[in-house]
């Protein structure tokens, strides 16, 4: 079993620049299937989920290759609508291939997608929207099959929840549907804006970016585009959480502070010094001065506190003075990392979707297991504040979303092997 070893109580110093966002890159790779011309995604990080996406694209017949740090695609001669089960089960983002393959092939079969075990993550909004556009939907045990007998058609559709994944799926489908599509109650996360930017650069006519109502006027094929995915705001928040846990002074460059503003405001409330200059954030903390607790956070859809940063906030609050609570309204099992926190000496409790942190914990190194992607990153951050050596076992989730997170933190002064 792979293990990451962290020696705590080392302050962080230096500058770091987040790579392209995982949550943008993965759906953009699926969207390249819609294009009649070549596409190039620039500066794509080497993540496990990116490698899985490349294998999936190859399996369905797409033409994709690495061009240095970029990913280059060309229109395929022929695509297949059957997504292999082992690839679908390896990542949640396999759901993004529903719309492109349905549009291109007329048929797609997707085994239930995998990823982190965060509780129920239904695809019903994706399927309801595609059905409204004319897709025939068949659920068969562990797989879903979609067919169309003619072109998809535009629709006025209201999402029952502002799902990021469903919004992206329906945007892609709308670009191929005949006529006008209006999506109401759409997600507004920055990654939605990035998808719209890519599709628009490829020739799509999309209005309403940054609002909950998106209008897509179809009618012309997508030609393809060269596009740089936006920087990873969750990685930026992870580096910021690491600084808050370890102390020191760092600069996070090249990632719009507005994209992770809720997390920066949270850190400022705990006593971390936060300053913003253009696309740079400077953070400083004296590890001899206790952080302030008493936080009451609710993770929800944008622009609320981001669900992916909830475990990171928990790591910061473990040692802070005062009881704090974090509630995640999106994922039922978001706080699986609490078992690791408890093993390190924090008397935290989970009831339903709420994590309660008494604060003031004195953390000590021990063996902990990474339960999921963000929970694993949170345990790594917490270990930076612990006395002694922490061994993070089974950290395989972490490379799915971070390009060498241990190496990035080592570059800032952490002692990690």
Question: Language-model segments: which ranges?
Answer:
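Short, structured segments at the rim of ligand-binding sites
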Residues: 1-417
């Amino acid at each position: 079993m792979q293990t990451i070893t962290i020696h705590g109580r080392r302050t962080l110093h230096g500058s770091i620049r987040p790579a392209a966002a995982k949550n943008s890159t993965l759906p953009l790779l699926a969207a390249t299937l819609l294009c009649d011309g070549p596409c190039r995604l620039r500066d794509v990080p080497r993540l496990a989920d990116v490698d899985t996406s490349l294998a999936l694209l190859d399996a369905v017949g797409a033409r994709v290759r690495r061009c240095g740090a970029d990913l280059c695609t060309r229109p395929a001669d022929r695509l297949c609508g059957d997504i292999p089960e082992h690839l679908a089960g390896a990542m949640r983002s396999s759901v993004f291939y529903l719309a492109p393959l349905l549009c291109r092939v007329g048929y797609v079969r997707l085994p239930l997608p995998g990823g982190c075990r965060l509780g129920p993550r239904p695809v019903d909004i994706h399927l309801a929207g595609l059905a409204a556009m004319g897709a025939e939907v068949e659920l068969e045990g562990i797989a879903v099959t979609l067919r169309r007998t003619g072109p998809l058609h535009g629709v006025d559709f209201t999402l029952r929840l502002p799902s990021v994944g469903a919004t992206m799926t329906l945007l892609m489908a709308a670009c191929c549907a005949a006529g006008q599509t209006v999506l109401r109650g759409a997600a507004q996360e920055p990654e939605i804006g990035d998808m719209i930017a890519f599709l628009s650069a490829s020739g799509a006519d999309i209005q309403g970016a940054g609002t909950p109502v998106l209008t897509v006027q179809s009618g012309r094929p997508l030609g393809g585009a060269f596009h740089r995915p936006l920087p990873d705001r969750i990685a930026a928040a992870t580096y910021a959480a690491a600084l808050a846990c370890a102390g020191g002074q760092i600069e996070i460059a090249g990632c719009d502070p507005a994209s992770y503003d809720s997390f920066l405001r949270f850190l400022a409330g705990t006593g971390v010094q936060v300053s913003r200059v253009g696309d740079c954030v400077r953070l400083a903390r004296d590890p001899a001065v206790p952080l302030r607790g008493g936080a009451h956070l609710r993770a929800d859809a944008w622009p609320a506190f981001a669900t992916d940063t909830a475990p990171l906030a928990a790591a910061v609050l473990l040692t802070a003075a005062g009881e704090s609570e974090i509630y995640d309204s999106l994922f039922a099992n978001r706080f699986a990392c609490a078992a690791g926190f408890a093993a390190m000496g924090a008397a935290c409790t989970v009831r339903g979707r709420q994590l309660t942190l008494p604060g003031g914990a004195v953390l000590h190194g021990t063996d902990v297991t990474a339960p999921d992607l963000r929970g694993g990153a949170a345990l790594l951050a917490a270990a930076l504040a612990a006395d002694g050596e922490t061994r993070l076992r089974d950290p395989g989730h972490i490379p799915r979303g971070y390009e060498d997170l241990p190496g990035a933190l080592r570059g800032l002064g952490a002692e990690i092997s």
